[in-house]
Amino acid sequence: MSTTTLTRREQRAKAQHFIDTLEGTAFPNSKRIYVTGSQHDIRVPMREIQLSPTLIGGSKDNPQFEENEAVPVYDTSGPYGDPEVAINVQQGLAKLRQPWIEARADVETLADRSSAYTRERLTDEGLDALRFTGLLTPKRAKAGHRVTQLHYARQGIVTPEMEFIAIRENMGRERIRSEVLRHQHPGMSFGARLPENITPEFVRDEVAAGRAIIPANINHPESEPMIIGRNFLVKVNANIGNSAVTSSIEEEVEKLVWSTRWGADTVMDLSTGRYIHETREWILRNSPVPIGTVPIYQALEKVNGIAEDLTWEAFRDTLLEQAEQGVDYFTIHAGVLLRYVPMTAKRLTGIVSRGGSIMAKWCLSHHKENFLFEHFREICEICAAYDVSLSLGDGLRPGSIQDANDEAQFSELHTLGELTKIAWEYDVQVMIEGPGHVPMHMIQRNMTEELESCHEAPFYTLGPLTTDIAPGYDHFTSGIGAAMIGWFGCAMLCYVTPKEHLGLPNKEDVKQGLITYKIAAHAADLAKGHPGAQIRDNAMSKARFEFRWEDQFNLALDPFTARAYHDETLPQESGKVAHFCSMCGPKFCSMKISQEVRDYAAAQTIEVGMANMSENFRAKGGEIYLKREEV
C-alpha cells in the first residue's frame, strides 16, 4: 500500500497527464480481436490471451512442443483496450450505436435542450473552460413512439444491440477446440435457465420477459451493448464521482478509463460536488460502458443541499437534463414511503442510503408521500422517450448486519415490485437494488424475496457485507456476500472499495474493488454453470501444472500483481522457466512431484505391459508364428 500523499494540485496534474497521454493498451501478451455478427456490421470486441506451447518431449537439443490455444475473454475496456485505436479524450469515443439508432427511424433531433438548467449552463461563459467541446445534439422518441430495448423485444424485434450481446456473452468459446479447456462442472443455478448457447433470440426473449435489461440511452451512442440479467454473466458496477471536498473532472475521467480497464461493466457517476453537469458530459462522451446516476443528488445541489426544498419540478428538470446527456440508468428511490420511515426508528443504524435519507427527510418535513412515488408514471414517460433504464433504489437497505432483513427493508422491496409493473406498462426497463449488510446465512432470502416480489426483474446489490468489523477491508467482507448472492441469482454486483465507510476512493482503490468483485462475479458464474465460464480456469490450471509462468501471469485477472509477487523472490528470468516457485522450492513442489509420479506410473504401465506380453509369448511355446486357430 502506497504511503505517498499527493497534494490536490499534484493529483489533478497527474490525472491530466494520464488523459493527455492516453493510448489504447492491451494487457501483456493479449491482443484485441473482433467477432463479427450476421447483421448491422456488428464487431464485438474481446481480448485474446496468447499462450506459449507445452513441452511434451524430445531432447535438450531437439525439444518437442504442443501448441496451446489462445483464450478469448470478455473485455469491457472498449477502444481503450485496442492499441490500433487513436484515443482523444477531447473528442470523445466513436459513436458505435448511432447508425443503429437512426436506422430505426423512431427518434427526432431536438431543436433545443428540454432542461432549463442545461440551457442555463450552456449560456454561462464562465464554464467554457470546463465544458466538453463536442457536445451532441440530443435525440428523443418521436411522438407516439417508445424507443426502449424492452419495447423492441416485446414487438419481436431482434435489435443489433441484442445480437452484439449474444456474441459477447458467449465469450468466443466456440473458438476453443481443446477438450481439456472445454471441460466444465455442472452448475447449480437455483432455477435460472442457462442455455448451452446464447442466441440473439434468447437475449430478446429475456428482455421481453423483464428478466434482463440492456441499459442503452439513445443519447449515449458511444456505449458498447451489454446485458444485466440472471441468465447471463454476473456483471460488476464501479462507482466514481466527485464530492464537495475532493476530486476534479480530470480525476473522474481517469477513474472512468481505469474502471473499464479493470473490468467494470457499468459505471455510476455519484458526483455531489461542483460542476456535476460538466463532469458527467466528459464521462459520457468517453465511456464505452453504460453510465448510471442518482438524480436526487444533483437535484439536491440545485436547492443548496436543503432536502425540504426539493420539488418535483426541480427533479423532473434534472431527469430531462441527464436523459438528454445520455445517462443509461437512473437510481430512483421511489419506494421510500412515508409509512415505512417509522419502521427504521428501532434500527441500530437507521437509514444509511443517501437517497433514502433525503427522501425520508422530505416526507417527514412535509408530511406528504414521496413525490417520486406520486409522480412515478411521469418518470416512466421520460425514461421511455430516451431509453433510460430504472434502477429502483433500496433507500431502506440495512446499514449493519443487526438491521438485516427487517420489516422496513422488505416493505420497500414489495413496493419496488409494484413499481416494476407500472414501469413495464411504459416499456421501461427495470432492475432492483438490494442490500447492504447481511450475514451469510440470511443472504439467500434476499434473492428469493426479490424474485417473488419483483417478478424476476434483475437484482443489483451492494455486496452485501457479511460482517461489520473490518473497515479498510470491506472489499473482502462484501466480496464474500457478493459471490454468494451472485450464485443465488443476482445479476449485477456494485463493487465496494477498501475505502468504504472511510473516504472517497482513489485510482488504486477502484482497481482493488474491481478485482475483488470480478473474482466474486466469476466465482458465481462457475457455481451457476454459465457456459464457458471454466475455460480460463482450466487454462490457468494447465499452465500452472506445466510451470508456464508467463502464461499464469497473463491469464490472471491482474497480470501485473501476479508477476510482481513472483518476482519479489525469483526476479531472474530463469525463475520464469523454473519448475518450482519460492514457496516450496525445487525439492518440495507438489506439482513437480506429481509430474514425476505421473511419468513413473506411465513407465511402470509400459514395463508391466511388456512383461505380460513376454509371459504370454512363452506360454504359447515361444513360436514366432502361430497357427490361425491359436490367434
Curated annotation (Swiss-Prot):
GO molecular function: 4 iron, 4 sulfur cluster binding; carbon-carbon lyase activity; zinc ion binding
Pfam families: ThiC-associated, ThiC_Rad_SAM
Enzyme class: lyase
Pathway as given in its UniProt record: Cofactor biosynthesis; thiamine diphosphate biosynthesis
Reaction(s) the record says it catalyses: 5-amino-1-(5-phospho-beta-D-ribosyl)imidazole + S-adenosyl-L-methionine = 4-amino-2-methyl-5-(phosphooxymethyl)pyrimidine + CO + 5'-deoxyadenosine + formate + L-methionine + 3 H(+)
GO-annotated cellular components: cytosol
EC number(s) on file: 4.1.99.17
Binding site for substrate: 239, 268, 297, 333, 353-355, 394-397, 433, 460
Binding sites annotated in the UniProt record for [4Fe-4S] cluster: 581, 584, 589
Requisite cofactors: [4Fe-4S] cluster
Example GO BP: thiamine biosynthetic process
Keywords, alphabetical: 4Fe-4S, Iron, Iron-sulfur, Lyase, Metal-binding, S-adenosyl-L-methionine, Thiamine biosynthesis, Zinc
Cofactor binding note: Binds 1 [4Fe-4S] cluster per subunit. The cluster is coordinated with 3 cysteines and an exchangeable S-adenosyl-L-methionine.
Binding residues for Zn(2+): 437, 501
UniProt family annotation: Belongs to the ThiC family.
Quaternary context: Homodimer.
UniProt function note: Catalyzes the synthesis of the hydroxymethylpyrimidine phosphate (HMP-P) moiety of thiamine from aminoimidazole ribotide (AIR) in a radical S-adenosyl-L-methionine (SAM)-dependent reaction.
Name the UniProt record assigns to this protein: Phosphomethylpyrimidine synthase
Organism: Salmonella agona (strain SL483)
Taxonomic lineage: Bacteria, Pseudomonadati, Pseudomonadota, Gammaproteobacteria, Enterobacterales
Gene: thiC
